[in-house]
Amino acid sequence: NWYSNSADYSDCLNTSTATIEFWGTLYNQIFTANNVIGTVDNETEDPTLQYYLAQALAVRAFDYFTLIQLYQFNYKGHESAMGMPLITEQNATEVAANGCARSTVQETYDFILADLNKAIELLTATTKERDDKRYVSLDVAYGIRARVYLAMHNYAEALKDAEAALAKTTATPYSRADVSKPSFINIEDNSWMWGILITEQDRVSTTGICNFPSHMGSLNYGYASVGGWRRISPKLYSEIPASDVRKGWFLNGEGVSANLPAAAQTYITGKKAPAYTQVKYGVLNDQW
């Protein structure tokens, strides 16, 4: 049961699966980022090293931002609450020997912003371009910082960074037609600014069910389609105007969505999906 840790509050224990997956994975990435940051001269003028240092700083910021949202309330009104243990390239050896006290929420967000500010500075200076969407480009760094400012309720700065991200990116939003059918699954689509290309040979694919499509894809085999359906409340569904394309991202009260191709509707009906099930995400090569 993927939800038992949360249901019995054991997800706060260091031995829980949830802790290993989230806390463990993110701090392992921070460990790697710290190694890069501690190796590269912070004031380097080498374009390649500037690029690598920016990657490490941006990823470390993203990881701490993810952690602080998982393990503490939002920023606004909780600035003095306990935040994350901030392990860096400067204190890693000391932490390994003696542990690390938690910083406050304010200190955690200050640290995140400092990393992002430096990453943006480096990505502005470097002439090296990414060759894969998995890497952080200047537009992505602005986008991450915009999200941080949103979490801090600093909407003016969030708007500035969102506009900067749009100005720097070559990505374009999905059209209404694009999202009027199950989609949001192809990293090659020009709407995606940042993400990892997953192949059929990757471990996350070969597991069959331990992946995002399994949990969120109602139109393919996985946890969702055998009973773990993701659903919207009837009340919220009724609030979505008929003219809003997002209404079709869910089955209606009769188990039908105007967004679904005939084969997809036949599939979801055959699976006896309950009313108001989410059908937003497509499947590989439209193999219903």
Question: Each predicted region: which residue ranges?
Answer:
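Hydrophobic-face positions in mid-chain alpha helices that act as interaction patches
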Residues: 6, 159-288
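Alpha-helical solenoid repeat scaffolds, predominantly canonical TPR units
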Residues: 32, 108, 115, 122, ...
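Start-of-helix signal in alpha-solenoid helical-repeat scaffolds, especially tetratricopeptide repeats
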Residues: 24-26, 54, 59, 79, ...
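Conserved, well-structured interaction surfaces
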Residues: 2-71, 99, 103, 121-124, ...
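Short, flexible, mixed-charge acidic loops at enzyme active sites
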Residues: 76-92
